[in-house]
């Protein structure tokens, strides 16, 4: 039997091994772990609280976790909870019954969502653009699914066949095959949609409801009620289509609300948590009408329904409380604190002011907050039409060290945000009296000390620092050498980049005259180069989408500067360095997890492996292949690579990653690689594999990659843990 027929006869057995048991789940910051027991993530306390929930809230325990915990998932099979620590690139594994810590799993950069299936834990890595898949029994990393930018919220269908993820900035959702760990399609909610964090799926799993904010970046007259709009978008999951004409405008069916982030569907009622306006819009999805408007605590981000379905519980993240909503009356009947946020009163008040639109001093009609454009103190990575021209949104993290502020450098103190609060957000302001920005903010009297509330807001912005861990990248010898070459170019006399971008902040905090893309000139303050990889688009007006584009024009667009000649790999080397610039320690938060010991593993339910092939013909040598493969396994496994030529029924196999040998079907063959123990995702590269001896140029070859349990025969498809196939013409 040819290998192709063997594959068709037995491939379904591999899919059955994934198991389809548990009910559908979605990411949340609060989950039930029993009939009355629940755990909630305390984002600003860096902890998790254990609760007894009924018609009131009783806190029974609390345990510290890593920096900036975000969501929690319950593993009923093992009585554990998984908590993502976004600020430390890790997941804490805790007991679900009492405050006990079992260990920590390291992840890629900025994990946000976590969801547990029958066998796996799925974790979204927001800054690495990956969905990581772990065996939930022995914690081995089984797969990494490459997706578009900033994956965040996760939802798993009840049959565990499909996984959906939101993309926070771009207003997209991706559909993923949760058995083969492959992306199927990415669906856009429109190029203005963003801040997409949650997906709720109806009971028939035909439609998805995604809260989001439409950002009107085309507006040339920015006002509080023309810049952003709160919506719920609807996606037809069967046809993978955004139903644009059916989307729900929350400001029309409800009163104006701010920053709809999370949601939960209960029957026909969709509970939409409007984080900035501190309320819930309950929408009847059949009638497209408002069922109720519920006021809750500060910045609600998570909601869960109790097992008896009598109550819903809301995580109010900024005031560290949980609200109880009676399902029959849709009324908040209780709200209790579940943590004491370990910050001084002034900073806590600053956090509240920064995130709220439910304060007439900060916003008009609950429409917009500082966090709408600067979520978590960062940037929305958009370009807006301000009176002085197109301006990309800068991050506020560590900004207190890089004044003056704004691209034009026209704010000489953080307290001058009073002008933005009044002019853009429509608030009455935090100061009694003028904003002291006439004729300009930097020429008027100081605002510091004029308002306790404004001082508190400025204190919070000043406290913003980078996470404890940098964005992790694969550091090979080649990439390290490229960074070193780029660093030498950056500091060289010829290029003199460091003249304006000196370490450790990589800015001179000075204004320079820049030639504008539309003609004319403008005075622009030198931006810091810290975290440059995550701050696209580049320049004050966002004219450059990539650093490669920027380096093609810069610094010749600075008055008095001439263009430098970057040849060969110099641009790539300089970009490699720019994207790897280290943040100074005083601008980074300290890690909280002093021990990152992995939890004690259990034997997995059954052997699972994954293997993925990449084949590239060397352009300079048509008979030379660049072969790479990525594989993993939760137990000991072998990986075979077999080459098939259908026209002649000839077969070859690879031995030890380099040697290729011809064989007849049925003969003993050696694995390409052997793993005596479980092994997480790792990559092998076999450059310049010469196939001249095959003498079959122009023919099509089929490459079969097969993973089996250690020592098992690759001829029996029942032994296959995974299979991948690629065709290539030499």
Question: What is the role of each PLM region?
Answer:
Residues 32-35, 75-78, 116-118, 158-159, ...:
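Residue-level detector of Asp-centered blade-edge/turn motifs that repeat once per structural unit
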Residues 23, 169, 179, 194-222, ...:
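Periplasmic c-type cytochrome electron-transfer domains
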Residues 23-46, 258-261:
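Beta-strand-rich domains and repeat architectures in extracellular enzymes and scaffolds
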Residues 52-56, 95-99, 135-139, 177-181, ...:
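Short loop/turn segments that connect beta-strands within beta-propeller blades
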Residues 713-730:
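Short beta-strand elements
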Residues 58-63, 100-105, 140-145, 182-188, ...:
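A short beta-strand motif characteristic of beta-propeller blades
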